From Swiss-Prot:
PANTHER family listed in its UniProt record: FACIOGENITAL DYSPLASIA PROTEIN, FYVE, RHOGEF AND PH DOMAIN-CONTAINING PROTEIN 5
Domain of life: Eukaryota
UniProt domain DH: residue ranges: 647-840
Entry GO MF terms: guanyl-nucleotide exchange factor activity; zinc ion binding
Predominant subcellular localization, coarse grouping: cytoplasm
Location within or outside the cell: Cytoplasm, Cytoskeleton; Cell projection, Ruffle membrane; Endoplasmic reticulum; Golgi apparatus
Known function: Activates CDC42, a member of the Ras-like family of Rho- and Rac proteins, by exchanging bound GDP for free GTP. Mediates VEGF-induced CDC42 activation. May regulate proangiogenic action of VEGF in vascular endothelial cells, including network formation, directional movement and proliferation. May play a role in regulating the actin cytoskeleton and cell shape.
One Pfam family this sequence matches: RhoGEF
Name of the protein in question: FYVE, RhoGEF and PH domain-containing protein 5
Amino acid sequence: MGSPESEVSPDVQEQEAATDNPEVFEEDSADAAEGEDQIEQEEPPNCDEEAYNRDAAAATMQVGEDLGEEGDHVQEDPAEESCQIIPFESDSVEEDFSPTLTENPYEIFPTESTSFCNNTYSLDESANGHEPVCEICVEEVPGVGPPLNQHDSLPDGSGEDSPVVPDVVVVPENEGPVDDALSSPYVMGVGLLSLGEGAQSDTQAASGTLSGYSTWEEGDSEGGQVPVDRKNIATRARPHSGKVAGHVPETVLEETGPETCSSGMGIRDTSDEVRKIGILPEGKPPECVRALPAKPRAFTLYPRSFSVEGRESPLSMFREPEGAGLDSHRVRRKEDNLSLPGAIGSSGSFSQRSHLPSSGTSTPSSVVDIPPPFDLACITKKPITKSSPSLLIDGDTLEKASKKKKSSFKRFLELTFRKKTESKVHVDMNLSSSRSSSESSYHGPARVLELDRRSLSNSPQLKCRTGKLRASDSPAALIFYRDSKRKGVPFSRTVSRVESFEDRSRPPFLPLPLTKPRSISFPNADTSDYENIPAMNSDYENIQIPPRRPVRTGTFTKLFEEQSRALSTANENDGYVDMSSFNAFESKQQSSEQEAESAYTEPYKVCPISAAPREDLTSDEEQGSSEEEDSASRDPSLSHKGEGQSRALVIAQELLSSEKAYVQMLQHLSLDFHGAVLRALENVEQEGREPLAQEELRQGLRELPAICDLHQGILESLEQRLGDCGEGQPQVADIFLAREQEFEHHAAHILQFDRYLGLLAESCLLSPRLATTVREFEQSSQGGGQSMKHRMLRVVQRLFQYQVLLTDYLNNLCPDSAEYDNTQSALTLISKVTDRANESMEQGENLQKLVHIEYSVRGQGDLLQPGREFLKEGTLMRVRGKSRHPRHLFLMNDTLLYTHPQKDGKYRLKSSLPVANMKVSRPVMDKVPYALKIETPESCLTLSASSCAERDEWHYCLSRALPEDYKTQALAAFHHSVEIRERLGISLGERLPTLVPVTHAMMCMNCGCDFSLTVRRHHCHACGKIVCRNCSRNKYPLKCLKNRMAKVCDGCFRELKLRNGPVPGSMRERPVSMSFPLSSSRFSSGSALSSVFQSISPSTFKKQKKVPSALSEVAASGEGSAISGYLSRCKSGKRRWKKLWLVIKGKVLYTYLASEDKVAMESIPLLGFTIAPEKEEGSSEVGPVFHLYHKKTLFYSFKAEDSNSAQRWMEAMEDASVL
């Protein structure tokens, strides 16, 4: 149903318009007649280019004349042209497109600036009297720009008093015939209209449109005027690198300083004078079309890059003011600069400065605001792809969504751009393009661009279609039209719209960070679909992000009425963006480790919930290789915060539970053990043996009942406090402060702890009854099977446990609370006692370190054991294929804790490796620097250190922890000694060997022959050596392979046959050189040749390599060498470095091609040689290069990995060069 205004007769409307502006009506009548002639003279789109070139050349010659006539003509005709903004709605799709064009002589001019129109609107409905309601996000800023000339004001003086309707400045086209042969698909078409067509419907539609627009402007601007700095906008032409015919240089808008005046805003030359444009004065009826002032104005329109996140990108439209005489700054728009006909876009190619207030105004897409909390999880799902244009989805109401078709994607209006050489519309849109400058080329004739909604990658396709355009429900909707010759009379409209469905999955009000700025141009029409990226895809390009401005959210409520849009995660085509470089969010951003870090390492930290779990950021190899790490994130101890319990309350409960166990242990010591020892000491006194020592021991044991009473009181207070607080803040620190004097019993016990233990051991030796008493207590259920020394250490251990628990508790308290200060005082009290323990006890520091490790490693039981000492800890990288994962190692003298770091700063135990059965080596691996291999009977670990010094330090500590009798056994076992294997109880073939890498052997490890193209490498599956084909012709069933036949070397074959017997007949191996089976008639018992072939051994055909004995004495991987490793060597006078394996043993330098070679290439006795380092110029430090001289003659130059390695090699060579 149309509104009452739409029912007014056309004659009445025309009379009103003429009455209000009689000059306009008369001029429009004449212009309409000219427009009809011009439409008839338009050429079809497929005509050649020569006509267009002639028109363009003629227009160029008239530039000076047009500019000279411009000012006078505008004064004579101040209201000759208007540009209106109206809705357009059409239910027709492709089949309705031709009739519409027939009725409407204007060409459809879809631009990217109209890509966010929410719906379509048909001409038929307007003609039938339906009045649409359109909300247009167009904001105008009066009062900014150059001062008005005397001809720049409206006749009625309302030029400065109409902030409701903006000025859309459009330069009219020439009245002559227009060549459409080369009409660009990206030029906004401008057609002409006769008076007879669509007159009535146009007036009605205009009234509805303008009234709707006026309502939107008033509501959005909140009665204020929005300033836009048009003075600081200039243009520049940016040609791309491709210097080809038809090349498309790009002209982008830039912001300049205040010194740039508006006269430099010209972009294209035309052959027509500048026209005035009419607007609606404030307070006048919307049906009365007024003339617009000629004052240069800018408009903020919402382009296609407006995203669902709630941030808009303004499309600034402005006109060149009269008197702009900088002809040299103008760019003639011809074939070579059709990158954006009439609409020049740029995505961050110039710095944007926002002058808009915070009253709900628009924000450019290149000035994206990211609301807190800073969360990039939703934009890090997939990398940027060239074929992923980001489009807009406009929110529809539930009623409108129910009327749509089954397809979840919105329909698109075809994109038909008509080129008008006289059009002088200047559009500044914040756009982006992912196309590189090398892809710039002429895009050919008019082209229709549409997005294939079935394409998963959202690559644009070429297709023509029309869509339904209706009044918009959101500020993202924009309907733009122009009337080139008419002002007060009815007019026809051409409307274009581009919709988007890609942003459906984005959460609301979360704008996307963009990548680096690039300029806009369009790819060739002949390229593939993924090159046809729309110009207005500014959702995945990086730009500089300014500080956030508040934006009203009430305007965008209808965009997110569908719950699926509001709750969805991220756009699948958005790329990851590192936001660490943006200064605006330095105080808000956090690393993933800091977000999940426990308050044990950072006090009073609130961790926000991350939208992307950490498991999503790990590689597939990491997830597959460490299932414990995935399960660790679901540890119940880590989920207390999610259950509503604070971390401080969890620590207090842990303190209570451990206190109960400690008090129970103290009761056994003070009652059972203390009483039994006192009775035994009385019997010793009766015997008269050293009463002084027994009295001292009795005094030391008297502290146990006092310590038990102290902790019994602490336990009762903790139970009462935690029972009363419930889920609130616990108060436990004052419990320790109230018993400050009683902790002196702990101090006295610690001071004489070592003395008491020594006296107890001596008394047990002197008194068998006391020794029996101690032994019975250790074996009883109260003793738990632990030694007396271990039980006594438990008493002191509790103080160190208090220290780590109170530290963690303190870090989870609010610094402003009273409990925070009390906890600091309690921690100071406990630290005084533990400091005494470190000073007086022999194992004080070691005990403290073991307590810290036990508290930090989850899954580890009691680390406190008699005789256990802490040696080293550190982080190494676990090597698994191409993946590298951090692993934290804790080395004690009897065990190695292999853990991986957790998010809260603690560690998850993966395995505990006994040091006694460990084999440690430093293998040389191609892609693993500073490798360290740890082998045990159960597992094999390959680790990588950060430096050679760190690797060597770990190797030294691990080797020192090995038992002396096991070191040589493990080292010999690594080098495949059968005798050592027997001593270690490792039978050949029962366990899979460690295969030698193929790059570590350049010759057979059995016979010493060199490997070549014909002599290939083969692994022995019994010992792991690399041997040649002649040395591996035998196979034997191995237990480690479930008795399957496997290739073994000759030495292992002999050993296996000697131990397990010959190969069973059913599994007997035929000669490799024979291609027919043993059951063949050729091998029958009656054949004379069978015995001959069977007697021939392949070893008889071996070519034994003649090797000097001096080169075969030492193997490359042999033990007992002073130093070994890879060095780069070059001969004197040459510059070519060659990487070789060098070994110094017995004052001889052996050179090998690889680390597992059996025979050396050469050997050099180092006696008499001198070593000199090569120092860098201007530096006294020794570099990685050093030289080997013999009698002042340069013999060799060597280059190590670093200076430390070079220093060790030089020291070893100097030692070997001296007798």
